[in-house]
Swiss-Prot record:
InterPro entries the UniProt entry points to: EF-4 (IPR006297), EFG_III/V (IPR035647), EFG_V-like (IPR000640), G_TR_CS (IPR031157), LepA_C_sf (IPR038363), LepA_CTD (IPR013842), LepA_IV (IPR035654), P-loop_NTPase (IPR027417)
A biological-process GO annotation: positive regulation of translation
GO MF annotation terms: GTP binding; GTPase activity; guanosine tetraphosphate binding; ribosome binding; translation elongation factor activity
Known function: Required for accurate and efficient protein synthesis under certain stress conditions. May act as a fidelity factor of the translation reaction, by catalyzing a one-codon backward translocation of tRNAs on improperly translocated ribosomes. Back-translocation proceeds from a post-translocation (POST) complex to a pre-translocation (PRE) complex, thus giving elongation factor G a second chance to translocate the tRNAs correctly. Binds to ribosomes in a GTP-dependent manner.
GO cellular component, one term: plasma membrane
Family: Belongs to the TRAFAC class translation factor GTPase superfamily. Classic translation factor GTPase family. LepA subfamily.
Keyword field: Cell inner membrane, Cell membrane, GTP-binding, Hydrolase, Membrane, Nucleotide-binding, Protein biosynthesis
Subcellular localization(s) per the UniProt record: Cell inner membrane
Top EC class, one word: hydrolase
Domain tr-type G: 3-185
The organism of origin for this protein: Blochmanniella pennsylvanica (strain BPEN)
Name the UniProt record assigns to this protein: Elongation factor 4
Length: 600
């Protein structure tokens, strides 16, 4: 019955114990036996276990018998805590009626704690606070409770103290979940409405979709229709995760489960769409969720032309599992065919690159990451560019606008000076400052290009690891942006072009030329490296040629003989420079990435 179903997510800042708590809930409810239990059960990717972070939201259906003896079905969705994967949180919460907000009592409230709370509050979810890691000697539940009250504004009198590691407080937490979180409000007799929360590619089953039954019931063999595209699909298999993949004949109203269709072209149905029955369709779609636009773009080029098809197919499959991943074909004069890909941040880029390497054995060259710029032309047209080549191809530019983010930084008071200095260095504008008992919330407007690269590391370094931040796109702002092009022996290398602010261009150009001087191997002729903005050369360097000692066998004798040998060598080097090709190793392209990370 629907009144005994509870759908909830676990939300928290990174490293506050979400995945460990999920493990303990699964173990307590008997989802897996002792032999099958491993740490981070729901972190199915090897990459997630290695890094100790949750990348993809995961779902598990648990059977729990309350203290009164009434059986309940709990649908738990574990979510990521890193700012780059906040879109996964909003997608997961769309299927829930409640959220479990975890706060590490050794760390207190951090930026993503506040951000995730706001997302849940906007969706009108019932929020239960759990104070985790209560077993540690450094635990300070009173301080954590005070911070929750002061910074977030939640009454913490009913907060549950627990330890996901030892299991302390887990029974009380489960009882609180079933009593405080409301059951799904759907109608089992209404026309089917199934919200697609996620999808991924399985090499045996094809495309698997994670769905939440908002209204009606879903049976194996039903013919579904997408309310977005109108396409029809036949249900081949349905089931739930316990966390094992268990097949079922029916998914009832309020349940969260998986779906496999006989039609393989389900790929065209986007995450956030609604399925309904083709014979008895619903009148309107479920309220979905807005697909986030990528913040960071980079060119990905496979090493070796034979890998082109594998690379295209790999991106196709990964985009099913990750709806925020954008890609389109791109051609570079120097690197050949590849794809221009969009990401939510540098960690997202790093994860995708690592998955392509591990899951598809692809070695890739990655060009310098950049943000999207808004271009206003003389005839008042708005154009968005995500690559240096697109910006260079435009003429009649009236102004270039860069994206600006609203950044909230939560930090201890004693590090306030260092963090403000860092924000000023990053061209930031202070919007607000709020003092709490021991912490401060700083609100700054910062250019997104300054945030995406190494701001996270710098803010952690300036605060000795205690500061945390979250950000969201605010607007586009007029800015003095320039393209730095790299010429090697007067030949433009498009893959090394970078976009930067005018103030940093000279420093950036010199740094890039110096890096390239060290990385390009010496050859039989001089290699001239130039960094240019338009027709102006802002930096120049030379990789000196290798020279054979042609005078080694001349012991004394007429000086004209020596001059002739040196002249012939000089002329030979000239001819070689005209027809010779400069071989650039792969490390050269990594230098551009490194230069971006070394911005002032």
């Amino acid at each position: 019955m629907i009144k005994y179903i509870r759908n909830f997510s676990i939300i928290a800042h990174i490293d506050h114990g979400k995945s460990t708590l999920s493990d303990r809930l699964i173990q307590t409810c008997g989802g897996l036996n002792e032999r099958e239990m491993t740490s981070q059960v729901l972190d199915s990717m090897e990459l997630e276990r290695e890094r100790g972070i949750t990348i993809k939201s995961q779902n598990v259906t648990l059977n729990y018998k309350s203290k009164s003896g009434q059986p309940y079905q709990l649908n738990l969705i574990d979510t990521p805590g890193h700012v780059d994967f906040s879109y996964e949180v909003s997608r997961s919460l769309a299927a829930c009626e409640g959220a479990l907000l975890i706060v590490d009592v050794t760390q207190g409230v951090e930026a993503q704690t506040v951000a995730n709370y706001r997302i849940a509050k906007e969706m009108n979810l019932k929020i239960i606070v759990a104070l985790n890691k209560i077993d540690l000697s450094t635990a300070d539940p009173n301080r954590a409770s005070q911070e929750i009250k002061n910074i977030i504004g939640i009454d913490v009198n009913n907060a549950i103290q627990c330890s996901a590691k030892t299991g302390y407080g887990i029974p009380e937490l489960l009882e609180c979940l079933i009593h405080d979180i409301p059951h799904p409000q759907g109608d089992p007799c209404a026309p089917l409405q199934a919200l697609i929360i996620d999808s991924w590619f399985n090499q045996y089953l094809g495309v698997v979709s994670l769905i939440c039954i908002k209204n009606g019931k879903l049976y194996k063999g039903d013919v579904l229709k997408s309310m977005n595209t109108g396409q029809k699909y036949t249900v081949d298999q349905i089931g739930i995760f316990t966390p094992k993949q268990v097949k079922r004949e029916i998914l009832d109203c309020g349940e969260v489960g998986w779906l496999v269709c006989a039609n393989k072209n389900i790929i065209k149905t986007p995450v956030g769409d609604t399925f309904t029955l083709s014979t008895h369709p619903a009148k309107k779609a479920c309220h979905g969720f807005k697909k986030l636009q990528p913040y960071v773009y980079a060119g990905l080029f496979p090493i070796g032309s034979k890998n082109q098809k594998i690379f295209r197919d790999a991106l196709y499959k990964l985009s099913l599992n990750d709806s925020s991943l954008f890609y389109e074909p791109e051609r570079s004069e120097f690197l050949g065919l590849g794809f221009r890909c969009g990401f939510l941040g540098l960690l997202h880029l790093d994860i995708i690159q690592e998955r392509l390497r591990r899951e598809y054995s692809l070695d890739l060259l990655v060009t310098a990451p950049m943000v999207v710029y808004e271009i206003l032309t003389i005839d008042n047209r708005i154009i968005y560019v995500d690559s240096p080549s697109k910006l260079l191809s435009l003429t009649k530019i009236k102004e270039i606008r860069e994206p600006v983010v609203l950044c909230n930084i939560l930090l201890p008071k004693k590090y306030l000076g260092e963090i403000i200095s860092l924000c000023i260095k990053k061209r930031g504008t202070q919007i607000d400052i709020i003092y709490h008992s021991t912490q401060v919330t700083l609100t700054y407007e910062l250019p997104m290009s300054e945030i995406i690269l190494n701001f996270f590391d710098q803010i952690k370094s300036a605060s000795h690891g205690y500061a945390s931040f979250e950000y969201k796109f605010s607007r586009f702002q007029r800015s003095n942006i320039v393209c730095i092009e790299i010429l090697i022996n007067k030949k433009r290398i498009d893959a090394l072009t970078v976009i930067t602010h005018q103030e940093q261009s000279i420093y950036h150009g010199r740094l890039l030329v110096n890096k390239l001087q060290k990385l390009i191997p010496r050859q039989q002729f001089d290699i001239v490296i130039q960094a240019t903005i338009g027709k102006r050369i802002i930096s120049r360097g030379i990789v000196k040629q290798l020279r054979k000692n042609v005078l080694a066998k001349c012991h004394g004798g007429d000086i004209t003989r020596k001059k002739k040998l040196l002249y012939n060598q000089k002329e030979g080097k000239k001819r070689m420079k005209q027809i010779g090709n400069v071989n650039l190793p792969h490390t050269v392209f990594l230098a551009v990435f490194d230069v971006n990370n070394n911005k002032k």
